Amino acid sequence: MIKKNWVLILDFDSTLISIESLDLLAEICLQNKINSASIITKIKNLTSLGMKGEITFQDSLKKRLRYLQIEDYHFDQLNKKLKNFISPSIIKNQTWLKKNRDNIFIFSGGFKRVIDPIALSLGLKENQVFGNEFLYGNNGSIMGLDFQNLLSQSNGKFLLAEKLGMKKDIIMVGDGKTDAEIKQLDKSAVFIAYTENVCRKSVLDIADRKAKTFDDVIDYFSNMK
């Protein structure tokens, strides 16, 4: 149960971690493949276009996944690598995160099975982590993405917050335009553009505040009235 009068929603890619996890997954899936460098560049460009709001997130996600044939074992490799990419100021402030975990959610267009290990290592609650999930066949093989999941859709973060009935003061922290969607929820919702890992002018232009590191986010809460 949330005891405080605020809810903090964190993005994952380029926020909690310093990179885009799908870009790294692409490098793993395509290693030793012909034209892998060219395909990875295309995937990274699509990631950037989606984060800047130049194409919809759903369009960006679908186009990126078309380039990849993802196998289950790829996630084992990805999870081993990702623990080395947690943002420095996030590591520094793990105690604060754990102390306030009842009020902290993760909303991400990334994959929940990738996010969960990082979230747990930071002391956050797995049942407050929301991300995209795969559909599996009877033999356990990945059949595709669950496009019924709200986070696979454009405007998904807003739709998810609405579905969860979030009525507290909402503070969304992230690096992309998809994170700013939360401002549609309520006039009191605050979007903080997170720039520790990447800074996008189009995102800063619509942000209520900027955080160079997670220390700035903590300062915001310290100064809340």
Residues covered by each model-derived region:
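Short, acidic/turn-prone active-site loops that include or flank metal/cofactor-
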Residues: G131-Y136, T195-R200, F214-D219
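Substrate-recognition "cap/lid" segment bordering the active-site pocket of phosphatases
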Residues: D116-I170
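Amphipathic coiled-coil/heptad-repeat helices and related helical stalk/stem segments
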Residues: I86, I90, S154-K157, G176
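A short, conserved beta-to-alpha structural element at the edge of catalytic cores
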Residues: S38-K42, L46-S48, V198-K212
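Anion (oxyanion) recognition and catalysis
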Residues: K98, L120-G123, G165, Q184, ...
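Alpha-helical substrate-recognition element adjacent to the catalytic core
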Residues: I2-L8, F12-L122, E126-E133
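Acidic, Mg2+-coordinating phosphoryl-transfer loop and its flanking beta/alpha structural elements
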Residues: S108-G109, K167-R209
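Short, charged, surface-exposed secondary-structure boundary motifs
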Residues: G137-M143, R200-D208, Y220-M224
